[in-house]
Amino acid sequence: MTKSQQKVSSIEKLSNQEGIISALAFDQRGALKRMMAEHQSETPTVEQIEQLKVLVSEELTQYASSILLDPEYGLPASDARNNDCGLLLAYEKTGYDVNAKGRLPDCLVEWSAKRLKEQGANAVKFLLYYDVDDTEEINIQKKAYIERIGSECVAEDIPFFLEVLTYDDNIPDNKSAEFAKVKPRKVNEAMKLFSEDRFNVDVLKVEVPVNMNFVEGFSEGEVVYTKEEAAQHFRDQDAATHLPYIYLSAGVSAELFQDTLKFAHDSGAQFNGVLCGRATWSGAVKVYIEEGEQAAREWLRTVGFKNIDDLNTVLKTTATSWKNK
């Protein structure tokens, strides 16, 4: 599927000069509220959430090719970003209904691809929970939903970034060794599926295909994959799509995420960048709540800067240009 000139131009705004997407993710809503609630007894306010996003945007977007924000709390942060930093806006509601089976997708009801574009977005991002082993009844609804969003983005001539998070309802802990064993197939098969032209996806935002905490040499305890098995899963992932794809940081530490990117590259994965969130900014949450705005800025200018600068250094030697796809 060839991209329109408008879509190509928009993705260029989200990338650096080398064609690498070095994007900062701060579209967290539910997860951010939970992180903030760990450090204060009262419920986080809208003002607190918006201000923290603004701080991160003001301090770190000069080092990122683009930033992913949500239109619920992130619009002030989008205005505060560096002039050279592109903008992705999230289209999904945060989280999913834990009382209903299937983790069905849901758009923010007051937004559309048209409205996100009018808000200044260079791309629309949508998060989908997907299990290739779920029932056809569940998965056909998800496929149809993604087809709708893809068609919307084609109509508006705006790039569609699809984020896929895998799960298994029979394995409640997705950080367990049990899930680590099934993760490679679930991640790679979902990528293969949503690379089909009918979905009109332009860039995939994906998990790495293994849990690095269970890889030989990375693991402190149980080993699920040898280094060679893990490397093969990365190669299989690369072969699963013809689309540009970028990795999400999944809340791991900055150091582990950087080591993961090196491992992916050494395995032969031709990934095209990252959308890195908590691995870059999570430490600022506690500082912001306990010590205030100025202390949070100082954290972002030192530790936050080091996290993103180290990541950019790693990307220079590991990621490849999406224009090669």
Swiss-Prot record:
It holds the Pfam family DeoC. Its EC number is 4.1.2.40. Keywords: Lactose metabolism, Lyase. Pathway: Carbohydrate metabolism; D-tagatose 6-phosphate degradation; D-glyceraldehyde 3-phosphate and glycerone phosphate from D-tagatose 6-phosphate: step 2/2. Disulfide bonds: none annotated. GO terms for biological process: 6-sulfoquinovose(1-) catabolic process; D-tagatose 6-phosphate catabolic process; lactose catabolic process via tagatose-6-phosphate. The keyword Lyase applies. Signal peptide: none annotated. It is an enzyme of class 4 (lyase). GO terms for molecular function: 6-deoxy-6-sulfofructose-1-phosphate aldolase activity; tagatose-6-phosphate kinase activity; tagatose-bisphosphate aldolase activity. It catalyses: D-tagatofuranose 1,6-bisphosphate = D-glyceraldehyde 3-phosphate + dihydroxyacetone phosphate. The keyword Lyase applies. InterPro entries: Aldolase_TIM, DeoC/FbaB/LacD_aldolase, LacD_aldolase, Tag_1.6-dipho_adolase. NCBIfam families: lacD, PRK04161.1, PRK12399.1, PRK12858.1. This is Tagatose 1,6-diphosphate aldolase. It comes from Staphylococcus epidermidis (strain ATCC 35984 / DSM 28319 / BCRC 17069 / CCUG 31568 / BM 3577 / RP62A). The gene is lacD.
